[in-house]
Amino acid sequence: MKRSLILCGVLSVLASPVAFAQADLAKAKNCMACHAVSNKVVGPAYKDVAAKYAGQKGAEDKLVAKVLKGGAGTWGSVPMPANPQVSEADARSLVKWILATK
């Protein structure tokens, strides 16, 4: 039991910098101009995106394409613009972070 608690503590400390790094990347790529983690802004909250796509096969690839190319109609009438300033690697990293949001 004691080892489990220690392991959980160590893992949470190690995971925290990754979460902060992804939030910083989202800010740097202007994602946070339209999105937030917990609240709808112009676009949906990341936790809502994670809930909608939880367990869906191909969700990661679909969302990477949406980040890069934009799209409309999934979350209402306001379209998501294409993001040419985001590399595919950064888009994939952001999508993985978004899908892990609770």
Language model segments and positions:
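Sequence/structural segment immediately N-terminal to covalent heme-attachment motifs in c-type
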Residues: 20-37
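C-terminal alpha-helix
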Residues: 97-101
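Axial heme c-ligation environment in periplasmic c-type cytochrome domains
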Residues: 33, 42-53, 66-95
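Alpha-helix N-cap and coil->helix boundary residues
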Residues: 21, 41, 58-62, 75
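N-terminal export/targeting leaders of redox proteins
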Residues: 1-22, 102
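Extracytoplasmic c-type cytochrome modules immediately beyond a signal peptide or single-pass transmembrane anchor
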Residues: 5, 11-12, 53, 59-61, ...
